[in-house]
Amino acid sequence: MLAPKKQKFRKAHKGRVMSKAKAGMTLAFGSFGLKSIDGWRVTARQIEAGRKAATRCMKRQGRLWIRIFPDVPVSKKPAEVRMGKGKGTPEFFAVRVSPGRIMFEIEGVEENIALRALELASAKLPVRTRIVRRYE
């Protein structure tokens, strides 16, 4: 799973995804991409599940780029623990995805296979998405 090698701080604020994406809104590598419509927090496990679904559909042909990286540590307290006594320990990593952000890109497969792969990857993510394509 994706996780940063080093961190400046062990724990992070919860934060919110408020504005539209400022960068990463256009296709940079592939011909087809998966663009977010909502702003939400996507975990490393969800990214990995989407990657596996897409590569399985593509039968390991072509190329898949993941344009997001989970760099925000999400902390959690154990079950049945009373309030207070500090913040919980970091459990997993997530990325805050803004509306308009390209998350996955595909190149080197037929159009119908690429669209199907991105649909399968989209089903694994908690954000509403749409498929975009490069017109040349």
From Swiss-Prot:
Keywords: Ribonucleoprotein, Ribosomal protein, RNA-binding, rRNA-binding, tRNA-binding. Binds 23S rRNA and is also seen to make contacts with the A and possibly P site tRNAs. InterPro entries: Ribosomal_uL16 (IPR047873), Ribosomal_uL16_bact-type (IPR000114), Ribosomal_uL16_CS (IPR020798), Ribosomal_uL16_dom (IPR016180), Ribosomal_uL16_sf (IPR036920). Gene3D superfamilies: Ribosomal protein L10e/L16. This is Large ribosomal subunit protein uL16. PROSITE patterns: RIBOSOMAL_L16_1 (PS00586), RIBOSOMAL_L16_2 (PS00701). Transmembrane segments: none annotated. The gene is rplP. Pfam families: Ribosomal_L16 (PF00252). Belongs to the universal ribosomal protein uL16 family. One of its GO terms (cellular component) is cytosolic large ribosomal subunit. Part of the 50S ribosomal subunit. GO terms for molecular function: rRNA binding; structural constituent of ribosome; tRNA binding. One of its GO terms (biological process) is translation. HAMAP family: Ribosomal_uL16. NCBIfam families: rplP_bact. The keyword Nucleus does not apply.
